Amino acid sequence: MKTAYFLIPGDPDARTGGYRYDRRIMDGLGNLGWRVMLRRLSATFPQPDAAALRAADAALAELPDRALIIIDGLALGAMPDVVAAHRERLRLVGLVHHPL
């Protein structure tokens, strides 16, 4: 089974359009045979503090080489340096459904 890691800031069960969209993508991937592993990031995104950025970096660092990583756009755009540090090792995809 193929695995994808989905990084989402805050509470993915929140009743907003963005989180609903994320859940639909995760469900759709599951229906296509993917195992989707959710990783929660700090709720401070899209304005993360230093601790949130360190935690996001650590979350990416612990994932296996060549893993497929989907990052919600709310977090992705706020941590370009963190993402850039992992771009050679991971397969990174941004899910941008509401550009900031």
What feature does the model see in each segment?
Residues 1-43, 63-67:
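N-terminal subdomain of nucleotide-sugar transferases
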Residues 10, 74-75, 98-100:
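Short, flexible active-site-adjacent loop segments at beta-strand->alpha-helix junctions, enriched
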Residues 14-15, 47, 77-80:
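Short catalytic/ligand-binding loop motif for oxyanion handling, primarily in non-cytosolic enzymes
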Residues 19-21, 52-53, 83-86:
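Short, glycine/charged-enriched secondary-structure capping and boundary segments
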Residues 32, 88-90:
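Helix C-cap/helix->beta junction micro-motif
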Residues 35-63, 71-73:
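A short, charged, and often flexible helix/loop element on the N-terminal side
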Residues 44-45, 95-100:
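A short, histidine- and acid-enriched strand-loop-helix "catalytic/donor-clamping" loop
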Residues 56-83, 91-95:
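Short N-terminal targeting/anchoring amphipathic segment
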